[in-house]
From Swiss-Prot:
Classification lineage: Bacteria, Pseudomonadati, Pseudomonadota, Gammaproteobacteria, Pasteurellales
Full protein name: Ketol-acid reductoisomerase (NADP(+))
Described function: Involved in the biosynthesis of branched-chain amino acids (BCAA). Catalyzes an alkyl-migration followed by a ketol-acid reduction of (S)-2-acetolactate (S2AL) to yield (R)-2,3-dihydroxy-isovalerate. In the isomerase reaction, S2AL is rearranged via a Mg-dependent methyl migration to produce 3-hydroxy-3-methyl-2-ketobutyrate (HMKB). In the reductase reaction, this 2-ketoacid undergoes a metal-dependent reduction by NADPH to yield (R)-2,3-dihydroxy-isovalerate.
Names of required cofactors: Mg(2+)
Gene behind the chain: ilvC
Active site: H132
Metabolic or biological pathway, per its Swiss-Prot or TrEMBL entry: Amino-acid biosynthesis; L-isoleucine biosynthesis; L-isoleucine from 2-oxobutanoate: step 2/4; Amino-acid biosynthesis; L-valine biosynthesis; L-valine from pyruvate: step 2/4
PROSITE patterns: KARI_C (PS51851), KARI_N (PS51850)
Length: 492
C-alpha cells in the first residue's frame, strides 16, 4: 500500500486539502432517518466507540459491537463496556455479514488488521466508516469498490461527545466521503445521518475530505494541542521551582492553569483570554508570544511539512513495526519529569490568580494557536478546519491535564497523537528552556506583572493585532454555532 495523498497530482492534492464547507442546519432536517432500520456494527469499544454508540442508539439506531473472540472470551474492558451498557456483542463472523454499516473505531495502528478481517465478511453494497482518516490517507488502505467509505470525526474526546449529547447538544464534527468509494452516491447521506445520530449537527458540521481531516488533525495534536502543552508544562514547572516557588503550588498552577486560561478561549477566543489580564500584563504576554513565535515558528512549519509529505506517518509506522520502542521510551521519560511528580497542593488558587500568575502560559497558548493555524492555512487547509484543529480543541485537551497531568493527556489521546506530541515536545522543550526561560522578567510566571505606564497607542495597536488575527475572525463566526457550550473548567 502507498500513501494515498502522495498518489494524487498537485491539483487533486489542493482540491482535497481545501475541502471545507460549513453545512446549513437545514441540511440535517432528516437527522438520522437515513440509517434507521439498518444494522450498524461498531468495531472497537473504547472511548469513541462506546460513546458514539450510546448516542447513536439513543437516536433510534440499531447498534451492536463486533469484538475479537479473545476479547469476548476473556471479558476484556471493551467487552465489559459494551455489555454493561446493554449492547449486543458478537464476533466479526457473527455480526459483520448482516451489517449495513460497519464503523471502525479501533486505534489507528489496528486499522489495517481490522480491514483485512472484516472486508471479506461484509455484504455487497454495504458501507464502512471511520472517525479518523489515517488508514485511508497515510496507510493507503484500498477498500472493496462496492463498499461506500465515509468518515464522521467529532472534534472532541469520546467522553465529551456523550456528555454534550446528554445535554441535548453535540460537538463540532467533520464529515467526508472517500472519493474512491462512493459507488451508489449515498456516502453523504450516510455521513450526515451518522453525524446527526451523535448530535454533531447541533454544534456545527463541516463537509470536509479524508485528506483535510487527517492533515489538519495531525498538525493540531502534534503542536498546540498536545506538544505545546507538554513542553510548556515541563519548562514552566522547572522555572517556578528554580525561582524558589513551592513545588506543590507550582504543580497546581500548571496542572489547572492550562484548563482555566483556555476556558476563556472557548468562550471568546484569544481576545477574551488576553482581556483577562491587566493592561500591563497583556502587553507583556503579547511581547512574549512574539518571542515564542520567533523561537518555535520553524518547528511548527517543519511538522506541517512532514505531515503533508508523509514523512511523519512513515516514521511512526516504522516505530509500530519496531514494537513502539520510541513511543514507550518517550512515555516513560515523560513519567519521570519533575512536573509529573510534583506534590499535591491543598491550597486554593482563584480563577484570576491563574491568569495573573500565568502570563508566560498565556503567551504560549497565543503563540501556539496562531502558529498552528497559520501553518495549516499556508498549506492549503481552510480556516474553518484549522480553527477546529487548533483553538477549539485546546480547552478539551487542557482538561485532561487537570485530571492527572500529562499522564492523563497521553492516555486519552490516540497513540498517533501521543507519538507526534513527543516528536514536537522533545525539540520544543530545550528550545524554550534555552531561548525563552532565561530572558523572563519579574511577573512573567508565578506572580503578577508589575504595573507600568501604558501608552494608549501601543495598547490600541496590540488590541487590534489580537482581534484581527484570522483565527479570531473565523472563530467568532464559528462560535456563533456553539452558543450553548457548557463550562468545562473544574479548577479550584
Amino acid at each position: 500500500m502507498a500513501n494515498y495523498f502522495n498518489t494524487l497530482n498537485l491539483r487533486q492534492k489542493l482540491d482535497q486539502l481545501g475541502r471545507c464547507r460549513f453545512m446549513d442546519r437545514e441540511e440535517f432536517a432528516d437527522e438520522a432517518n437515513f440509517l434507521k432500520g439498518k444494522k450498524i456494527v461498531i468495531v472497537g469499544c473504547g472511548a469513541q466507540g462506546l460513546n458514539q454508540g450510546l448516542n447513536m442508539r439513543d437516536s433510534g439506531l440499531d447498534i451492536s459491537y463486533a469484538l475479537r473472540p479473545e476479547a469476548i472470551a476473556e471479558k476484556r474492558a471493551s467487552f465489559q463496556r459494551a455489555t454493561e451498557n446493554g449492547f449486543k456483542v458478537g464476533t466479526y463472523e457473527e455480526l459483520i455479514p448482516t451489517a449495513d454499516l460497519v464503523v471502525n473505531l479501533t486505534p489507528d495502528k489496528q486499522h489495517s488488521k481490522v480491514v483485512a478481517d472484516v472486508m471479506p465478511l461484509m455484504k455487497k453494497d454495504s458501507a464502512f466508516g471511520y472517525s479518523h482518516g489515517f488508514n485511508i490517507v497515510e496507510v493507503g488502505e484500498e477498500i472493496r469498490k462496492d463498499i461506500t467509505v465515509v468518515m464522521v470525526a467529532p472534534k472532541c474526546p469520546g467522553t465529551e461527545v456523550r456528555e454534550e449529547y446528554k445535554r441535548g447538544f453535540g460537538v463540532p464534527t467533520l464529515i467526508a466521503v472517500h472519493p474512491e468509494n462512493d459507488p451508489k452516491g449515498e456516502g453523504m447521506a450516510i455521513a450526515k445521518a451518522w453525524a446527526a445520530a451523535t448530535g454533531g449537527h447541533k454544534a456545527g458540521v463541516l463537509e470536509s475530505s479524508f485528506v483535510a481531516e487527517v492533515k489538519s488533525d495531525l498538525m493540531g495534536e502534534q503542536t498546540i494541542l498536545c506538544g505545546m502543552l507538554q513542553a510548556g508544562s515541563i519548562v514552566c514547572y522547572d522555572k517556578l521551582v528554580a525561582d524558589g516557588k513551592d513545588p506543590a503550588y507550582a504543580g497546581k498552577l500548571i496542572q489547572y492553569g492550562w484548563e482555566t486560561i483556555t476556558e476563556a478561549l472557548k468562550q471568546g477566543g484569544i481576545t477574551l483570554m488576553m482581556d483577562r489580564l491587566s493592561n500591563s500584563a497583556k502587553l507583556r504576554a503579547f511581547e512574549l508570544a512574539e518571542q515564542i513565535k520567533e523561537s518555535l515558528g520553524f518547528l511548527y512549519y517543519k511538522h506541517m511539512d512532514d505531515i503533508i509529505s508523509g514523512h511523519f506517518s512513515a516514521t511512526m509506522m516504522a516505530d509500530w513495526a519496531n514494537g513502539d520502542k520510541d513511543l514507550f521510551a518517550w512515555r516513560e521519560a515523560t513519567g519521570k519529569t519533575a512536573f509529573e511528580n510534583a506534590p499535591k497542593y491543598d491550597g486554593k488558587i482563584s480563577e484570576q490568580e491563574y491568569f495573573d500568575n500565568g502570563v508566560l502560559m498565556i503567551a504560549m497558548v497565543k503563540a501556539g494557536v496562531e502558529l498552528a493555524f497559520d501553518a495549516m492555512v499556508a498549506s492549503g487547509i481552510y480556516e474553518e478546519s484549522a480553527y477546529y484543529e487548533s483553538l477549539h480543541e485546546l480547552p478539551l485537551i487542557a482538561n485532561t491535564i487537570a485530571r492527572k497531568r500529562l499522564y492523563e493527556m497521553n492516555v486519552v489521546i490516540s497513540d498517533t497523537a501521543e507519538y507526534g506530541n513527543y516528536l514536537f515536545s522533545n525539540v520544543a522543550t530545550p528550545i524554550l528552556a534555552k531561548e525563552i526561560i532565561p530572558n523572563l522578567q519579574k511577573g512573567d510566571l508565578g506572580e503578577p506583572t508589575p504595573a507600568v505606564e501604558v501608552d494608549n497607542i501601543t495598547l490600541r495597536d496590540v488590541n487590534d493585532a489580537i482581534r484581527n488575527h484570522p483565527v479570531e475572525l473565523i472563530g467568532q463566526e464559528l462560535r456563533g454555532y456553539m452558543t450553548d457550550m457548557k463550562r468545562i473548567a473544574v479548577a479550584g
